Amino acid sequence: MGSISMHITPSTALPIRHFRARVSCCSSGHVSFIKDVAATEPPMHLHHLLKVLQTRGETIISPGAKQGLIPLAIPLSKNSSGSVTALLRWPTAPPGMDMPVVEVWRSGVRLIARNVDEYIHRILVEEDAQELTELYRASGEAGEKLYEKGAFAESEIDNLDVYVLKKVGLFPDLLERKVLRHFDEGDHVSAMVTGEFYTKKDLFPGFGRPFVYYANILQKVGRNVEAKDAARVALRSPWWTLGCPYEEVASIAQWEDEQIEFIREKVSDEGRFEDLHKGKAPIQVALDVAAFLLDLASIEGTWSESLNHIAKCYEEAGLHHISNFVLYTD
């Protein structure tokens, strides 16, 4: 289908040295890390998700093993191909996206599930469709709460993806697969309707990927002006949420390097002074610079080189806990 692609799968904390002894690769280590280092409430069923991931063959890794990754990620597991599943700790979370499950890659993250519960639920449905039970047993009380075994078969819904979207939740890869299915059937109208639905602001807030995908759809059907507009909307989101290299989206948006140069100017001392001179609040300037630095690091793959500068911005914005979290590595 041309360029459309799928990838399945935004008070001062204690000194960081106080946390190291508490962090381990077990679920209690992840829970304490999220409470003490990430300074937020861990998902209720995180322990059960880790057990499920381990049971299906993934290696549970330390939440502090963030070297080379976007600093907002909390690693959970690594699969046999080296792909890392993580939680995303937003500095300021969009509504309904407090701690989504993501796949981490060089230039940022790809959204897997909006929350831990929906991810567990989906995994259990997909296992049940194969008439297996190992992951359900591993999920413990979370599985009993989230899914009743046999519900998929009893629903008489033939298509597993349709069941998950109706009964479990919305997942980016399933919506993208639905678009592909419509194109395979020659139904371009339904493909475009699904693509537009994917971009609804309350579905996956904070993520640019839906608009990238919609731009590809529009380009596929020859609506290049609308594709350009959709790509430009995508680039208003954090660039590390695009799900593909920045250059691919900038090409559809018909932008050269001017946007990158604009961002570089914004993070310079002169750019910060200019924003302050225009009356922007110092806290907002610091938050903007941190966001711009993350954008630039996602293009250049230089997360480690930007850590201190990003952390300093969050410190200046009064987000001391985020500053400590960003700097933390095992």
From Swiss-Prot:
Q: What is its main location?
A: plastid
Q: Which GO terms describe its cellular component?
A: chloroplast stroma
Transit peptide, residues from-to: 1-35
The protein's matches in InterPro entries, at most eight in alphabetical order, are given as: PAB
* One BP annotation, GO: chloroplast proton-transporting ATP synthase complex assembly
This protein's source sits in the domain of life called Eukaryota
User: Subcellular localization, per the record?
Assistant: Plastid, Chloroplast stroma
Disrupted-gene phenotype: Severe growth defects, and inability to flower and produce seeds.
User: Keyword annotations for this protein?
Assistant: Chloroplast, Plastid, Transit peptide
Q: Tell me, in a sentence or two, what this protein's role is.
A: Involved in the assembly of the F(1) ATP synthase in chloroplast thylakoid membranes. Functions downstream of the CPN60 chaperones to promote assembly of the catalytically active core of the chloroplast ATP synthase. Assists the assembly of the ATP synthase gamma subunit into the active F(1) core downstream of CPN60-mediated folding, which is critical for the biogenesis of the chloroplast ATP synthase.
Q: How does it assemble?
A: Interacts with ATPC1.
- Name it: Protein IN CHLOROPLAST ATPASE BIOGENESIS, chloroplastic
Q: Which organism is it from?
A: Arabidopsis thaliana (Mouse-ear cress)
